[in-house]
Each structure stands twice: as structure tokens, then as C-alpha cells.
Amino acid sequence: MNAKKQSRIRRARRARAKMKELGVSRLCVNRTPRHIYAQVISAEGDRVVASASTLDKDLRSGSTGNRDAASAVGKLIAERAKAAGVSTVAFDRSGFKYHGRVKALADAAREGGLEF
């Protein structure tokens, strides 16, 4: 594993430990060059309450690796989380910089009604 990936994983581990202390559900984001994924994980950390990604049927048709796709995933995860009864989450960016696609997803989720 290269140093860049190791430091990202280390940052993510520290952030997740802090979120566990808070005891709230977390919106976990993962990105690859081609897709972006989002999951709302329960406060206990044992189950996924809601999930959305660019692999979903309605989002798969267009371009999946850009900011527009990330904001579509953000809107979708906000809808699904609210339908599951979750309105407040901690944003887990998985060690990725809060920039570009990760920021677009977070902004769209906030507009969709999730509180961070």
C-alpha cells in the first residue's frame, strides 16, 4: 500500500473513532475514479440504514464520475435517509479531501434535508 493511501486510511480511522464517541448515524462516502457511493450507517455501526450510488439504475445512464453525478447521489441518499427516519448524521468523508465530488455530494445531501 502506498503512503498516500495509508495516510487516507489513517485519517478515516481517526474520524470514525470520533464519530463513534458522538453516537450519531454517519453518512459514509466512498469514491472511485468512475463511481461514488454513499451509505447512512446506524449509530451503533452495525447496519446500513440507507444507501445510494451511481450504480443505481436511474443514475447509471449518464456520466457517473463527475460532480453532477455526485450531487444526484447526495439528493437520493437524503431522500432515502429521511424515509428511513434519519435526519441528523455525521459526515464521514473516508479520509478524502472535502473538495470536488465529495463536497458536491455533501452539499446536495444538505439541500435534501439532512443535517450534519
From Swiss-Prot:
GO cellular component labels: cytosolic large ribosomal subunit
Superkingdom of the organism of origin: Bacteria
Entries under InterPro entries matching the protein: Ribosomal_uL18_bac-type, Ribosomal_uL18_bac/euk
Secretion signal span: none
SUPFAM superfamilies, A to Z: Translational machinery components
Keyword Ribonucleoprotein set for record: yes
Record-annotated disulphide pairs: none
Family to which the UniProt record says this protein belongs: Belongs to the universal ribosomal protein uL18 family.
Subunit structure: Part of the 50S ribosomal subunit; part of the 5S rRNA/L5/L18/L25 subcomplex. Contacts the 5S and 23S rRNAs.
Summary of the function given for this chain in its UniProt record: This is one of the proteins that bind and probably mediate the attachment of the 5S RNA into the large ribosomal subunit, where it forms part of the central protuberance.
PANTHER family tied to this protein: 39S RIBOSOMAL PROTEIN L18, MITOCHONDRIAL (PTHR12899), LARGE RIBOSOMAL SUBUNIT PROTEIN UL18M (PTHR12899:SF3)
Protein's UniProt name: Large ribosomal subunit protein uL18
Taxonomic source organism: Saccharophagus degradans (strain 2-40 / ATCC 43961 / DSM 17024)
